[in-house]
């Protein structure tokens, strides 16, 4: 329970914060204590989902195209993969690793005698490692809140705790965080079934290091929105020989400056009048006198805060640029990003993304090998029908980027290479099966040849009968 409490108190708040920034609940900008408290003024809280943009882009780039698993002929492995939607599972795991820096997969053998994979929530799952030079997992823990009915028929929130080791699964009775754990049931298992996927060796999410920049961008955009709103409420300033709160005004008449109570009352009246002027967007200023004893001019006009458009917009642009730069995520809205860039130029523009993806994929591939190793262990214990050695598997990741395949093929053909027509047909719009196009063209050519032979009177009896034109007699 100490380890669960440690995870709940020390790790879960960080993971929850990362989840909030992914979902657009940027905690810094929406915290009431971090913004203006002035009544009567705009207080917009503009939230920008950079976290979601970064995580979704990195995930789509790396695993948007399905991971290809190359293996020898193995019907049992094909059966297992057909029973699991591994494309979706890989996407969920990669997204969790990108968001939280870690992801968890649980593998079990179902009632259908097939191994199944489930994605666990990183906010309620952790793995305990040994103290070896190369630390190995010794226990996986999952704790999640459930609602239970108490003795007074009232619903209570309690934690359902599960643990796994290499040979035992334990389920505990619902309990509170500070209560004793009581075993509900135990089962014997034959493999450590929980896999921890790491985003990097530090288990840091892709947008975690730019959260301070996201907070600054939120604040800058919010301040701009506040200014644009308050700009419509310009303050009227009247300067002249008027009775205001200044010394010498009629408010001072009959007031003994040495009387503390009267001074406090006068101060309160001044504050009330200042508030009234502020609420009315009006400022009364008493005119003064020049060195020659002449009264200064009387005037009236509106004042408002000056807005440095160029400086403010440049500041926000720098923040947005730094967010993309330090997260290795290209800004797809940048008009200089795409244009008519060649394939090589585009590769340079996303070089940071490609390098980051290489690191992330290496870590993810370790988890994939563990997945099939666990499946092999469970299969060996149950049926021994799996013939593939997990260590012989090859995983291929393909960048999910737009490519100009037609131009590439054109350049290859110009260089003297020959490309099969059936291969080219796959680039036609709405074509899913290039082979069907090839077969259709072959049928059309055959029909044209037959019709030509019929027209020239050289068709065979079979061609004429198949054509349905006429029947000939054989002498």
Describe the residue ranges of each PLM region.
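Extended, helix-rich architectural segments
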Residues: 1-120, 471-475
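Short secondary-structure junctions and interdomain/linker hinges
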Residues: 25-29, 61, 83-89, 100-104, ...
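A short, surface-exposed helix-loop junction/capping segment
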Residues: 71-77, 298-302, 350
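Short amphipathic alpha-helical segments
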Residues: 72-76, 81-90, 97, 209, ...
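A general structural signal for short secondary-structure junctions and capping/turn motifs
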Residues: 94-99, 130-133, 151-153, 225-229, ...
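Extended, regular secondary-structure scaffolds
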Residues: 104-212
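Extended, charged amphipathic alpha-helical segments
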Residues: 186-345
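C-terminal helix-loop subdomains that flank or include functional centers
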Residues: 269-293, 311-314, 318-475
């Amino acid at each position: 329970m100490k380890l669960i409490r440690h995870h709940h108190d020390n790790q879960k708040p960080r993971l929850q914060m990362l989840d909030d920034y992914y979902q657009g609940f940027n905690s810094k900008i929406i915290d009431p204590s971090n913004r203006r408290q002035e009544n009567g003024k705009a207080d917009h809280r503009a939230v920008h989902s950079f976290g979601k943009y970064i995580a979704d882009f990195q995930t789509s780039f790396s695993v948007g195209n399905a991971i290809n698993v190359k293996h020898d002929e193995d019907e049992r492995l094909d059966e297992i993969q057909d029973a699991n939607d591994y494309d979706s599972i890989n996407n969920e795991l990669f997204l969790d690793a990108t968001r939280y820096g870690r992801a968890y997969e649980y593998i079990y053998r179902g009632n259908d005698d097939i191994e199944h994979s489930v994605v666990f929530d990183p906010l309620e799952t952790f793995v305990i490692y040994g103290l070896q030079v190369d630390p190995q997992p010794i226990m996986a823990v999952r704790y999640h809140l459930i609602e239970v009915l108490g003795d007074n028929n009232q619903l209570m929130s309690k934690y359902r705790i599960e643990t796994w080791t290499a040979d035992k699964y334990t389920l505990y009775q619902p309990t509170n965080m500070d209560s004793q754990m009581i075993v509900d049931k135990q089962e014997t298992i034959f493999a450590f079934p929980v896999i921890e996927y790491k985003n990097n060796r530090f288990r840091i999410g892709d947008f975690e290091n730019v959260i301070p920049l996201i907070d600054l961008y939120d604040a800058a955009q919010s301040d701009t929105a506040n200014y644009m709103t308050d700009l419509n409420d310009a303050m009227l300033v009247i300067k002249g020989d008027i009775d205001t709160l200044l010394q010498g005004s009629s408010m001072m008449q009959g007031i003994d400056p040495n009387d503390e109570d009267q001074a406090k009352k006068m101060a309160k009246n001044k504050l009330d009048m200042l508030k009234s002027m502020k609420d009315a967007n009006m400022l009364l200023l008493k005119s003064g006198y020049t060195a020659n004893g002449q009264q200064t001019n009387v005037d009236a006009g509106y004042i408002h805060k000056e807005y440095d458009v160029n400086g403010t917009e440049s500041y926000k642009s720098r923040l947005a640029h730094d967010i993309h730069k330090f997260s290795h995520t290209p800004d797809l809205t940048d008009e200089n990003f795409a244009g008519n860039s060649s394939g090589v130029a585009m590769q340079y523009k996303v070089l940071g993304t490609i390098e980051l993806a290489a690191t992330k994929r290496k870590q993810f591939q370790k988890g994939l090998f563990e997945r099939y190793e666990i499946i092999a262990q469970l299969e060996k214990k149950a049926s021994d029908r799996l013939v593939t050695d997990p260590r012989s598997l090859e995983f291929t990741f393909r960048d999910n980027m737009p490519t100009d395949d037609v131009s590439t093929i054109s350049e290859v053909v110009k260089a003297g290479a020959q490309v099969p027509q059936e291969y080219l047909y796959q680039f036609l719009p709405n074509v899913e099966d290039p082979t069907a196009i090839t077969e259709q063209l072959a049928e059309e050519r055959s029909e044209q040849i037959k019709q030509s032979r019929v027209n020239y009177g050289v068709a065979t009896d079979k061609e004429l009968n198949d054509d349905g034109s006429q029947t000939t007699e054989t002498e």
